[in-house]
Amino acid sequence: MMSITLIVVLLISYQLVPSNAFGFARFANPVQQYGPSTMAGRPSCSNIPLATTTDLTKKQFQYNSARSQTHLLSTADASAESPEPIKPTAIKASVRKTVKKLLPLGLMLFFILFNYTILRDTKDVLVITAPNSGAEIIPFLKTYVNLPSAIGFTLLYSSLLNRMSSEKVFYTVMTGFLTFFGAFAGIIYPNRMLLHPNAAADWLSSFLPAFFLPLVAIFRNWTYALFYTLANMWGSVVVSLLFWGFANDITTVDEAKKYYPLFGLMANVALIFSGQYVKYVSGLRTSLPAGADPWGASLNLLMAAVVAGGGVVMGLMRFMQTCVLTDPQCVDPNKEAKRKKQKTSMSMADSTKFLANSPYIRDLATLVIGYGMAINIVEVTWKSKLKAAFPDPNSYSMFMGNFSTMTGIVTLLMMLGGRIIFKRFGWGVAALITPITILTTGAAFFSLTLFPGFFAPITARLGTTPLMLAVMIGAAQNILSKGAKYSLFDPCKEMAYIPLDAESKTKGKAAVDVIGNPLGKSGGSFLQQILIAVFGTLEKSTPYLGGILGAIIIAWINAAKSLNKQFLQKSEEMEKAEWPLEDFDKKEQ
């Protein structure tokens, strides 16, 4: 862990230390040579159209020189003269204040995603391997349990925001999650036979049509369904809403472009660590004495790690509130005071009406819903094959541990290239990579599922079965898709909130992340239910699911292109508001 932290610190330091401190020029633009201490909060010339770069560069240089009460130089003179060397003490101070602000954020994301991976793997094992259950229960869970729960939480969250500070809301929500997960392992699961209505479920199964059996399974294993719902909400609420909402409030657009991809370094190392922890716990089950409940013992260890990780996150949030947000070198005190005073007093109905009339929020919601529907369509089909290959909870959990580890490794590698993509190609290209990745890898998986005979020679040559080959290709598809999501889609989505006003940030983020994500998954699940009702089985519905997947991704790509234009426009407006060149021109005249 210390080595990973050191790597992140060095990467952050590299972004802060001016190139002339090492005796070489990294920047081609003369204005950029003056370093972060001069250009903090100013827009990057690389994001300005070429036709206006020269004039704007001159104004930037004059503006900064006027502030330091030095002689005004022309652009040509600025290019000819060498900048004054920056003192090592200034470099150390710049590195220190940035590490103080960004390292705790990276650690928070590490432990939040550490918990998320454990919860994600555990919830699948619980509901898929439960009595009279299977992968077909997932579409019904997401439609009839997850979506109503998400809508209810959005109403609660909106009410809490109007009554409490954002810091208190963070602690309240985190405490609720951690209390349930701790109680599930210690109280609920050991008493599951008393809590589960098995007799009533058996009676319902005796006369209801087969289409309703997944709903009966949810009723039978209602505590597992509750765990599945809250574990699923951890990703949309704690990761997307609480963490990224807080990070967006205290981070500028320029900082986000530089450091949001780097946050993924620690975040995806969390996937590796948590995956190996799940695998380690799965191995301990075999050493338990006869008569012991191996899955109950595993739950105790897994949920203990979740509660401990959540406690660390709350401690880091307290450190940010008391030591970072009160430091004027880390956060502008005027902006922080304004942020704390901001209250969202609109009712939920007014907020929903406002967001429905916002093309920006609609396009952003389309991205989130599109990802949820696309990944759900592919994932459910893959998990049905995964249960057939690993029917035992121990082997299923061990496979998911390895799956999470590989997801972390692949995402970590993709994350290293994320900043290069943002820097060279911009937000628009980065936003298109995830849907294109899902489209190509999904086509490969569905091809194997639809045309197994065509791949029979390959299966025989590899010495495996068609089932295992489908499991492995589906795993590769999910790993690449999630890697693209974590390394590019999530940073793109969070950057899109930064130029928005306070109302759109808070209510818009709540609506998009907490409702949009489950709506996407529930929408995909609802489509699967309709196809299953029409064609009888999920396997017979696969060709139509492939066509629906293509249509969803086309809509996703169109929304990303539209949002890119709006994002660039709003970012330019935000930069002009923070850096009014017109006012300087008037003073110059």
Predicted region positions:
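Substrate-agnostic recognition of the 12-TM MFS/MFS-like secondary transporter fold
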Residues: 101-156, 205, 209-212, 219-284, ...
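A helix-boundary/kink motif common to multi-pass secondary transporters
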Residues: 164-169, 252, 286, 298, ...
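Hydrophobic/aromatic positions within or immediately flanking transmembrane alpha-helices
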Residues: 139-142, 170-171, 257-261, 300-303, ...
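N-terminal chloroplast transit peptides
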Residues: 1-52
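C-terminal transmembrane helical hairpin of 12-TM major facilitator-type secondary transporters
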Residues: 431-485
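Intracellular loop-helix junctions on the cytosolic face of multi-pass helical membrane proteins
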Residues: 25-30, 75-107, 163-168, 175, ...
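Cytoplasmic membrane-interface "Motif A"-like loop-to-helix N-cap segments
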Residues: 162-179, 294-298, 423-436
